[in-house]
Every structure is written in C-alpha cells, then in structure tokens.
Amino acid sequence: MRINQRDIVNVEFIFPDGKAKNHYAIVVSNNELIESEGFVYLVLITSKDYNSNYYYELSNDMVLNFSFSKQSYVKCHILMTTMENIVSFPLGQIKKQYFDKIVNKIIYSIF
C-alpha cells in the first residue's frame, strides 16, 4: 500500500457532471479498505470558497510536509472513489485532529 488515510494526493477528480480536472484531494478511506480492495475514497480540495456550509477551510499549519500555494478548502460534499494506482504518491498529510474535524463535516454535509 503506497497511500494512507489522511494523505494529500493529486488526482484527476471526476465531478458529478462527468467533467474531470486535476485537483488535490484527501484520502478519507481507512487503510484496511485500501489494502483489501485497492480503491480509495477521496474528498476534494479546491481554492474556490463557495458553498460555505459544506467546506472546511484549510491552512498550512494543519498539514504535514506540504504547503498550499493558495487559500484552500475541503469540499466536504464532493467525494470520489477511484483505484489506488490512479492517484499520485502522497504529497503531504492532514494532521489527525484536523482530519477528524473534516470527517465530522463530511458526515454533516452528506447525512
């Protein structure tokens, strides 16, 4: 397994309308699922700040070994599933305490 939960990766993110664009994303699936099935759940990171009810604002102090060049937001209502071998190697990692808050915001946003 080359990626883990909380990793920041770069991936061709496929949106609900079928369009695709390279974006940063956070691996949200747990390591057991990645290992056993070979696929990952990802949540979108973008510099767009619309739909504030559904985003989690990021800052560089929330991240290990990586810096965003622009203000960035996790779009907690936009997730994607893809195969592990499709995503880039980890670029950095979200610190655990912030990842837990992001997961809670995903749950709030979707359920």
What does each of the following model-derived ranges do?
Residues 19-62:
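Compact nucleic-acid interaction/catalytic patches
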Residues 1, 63-111:
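C-terminal terminal-subdomain/extension
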Residues 14-18:
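Short, charged beta-turn/beta-strand-edge "cap" motif at the junction between a beta-strand
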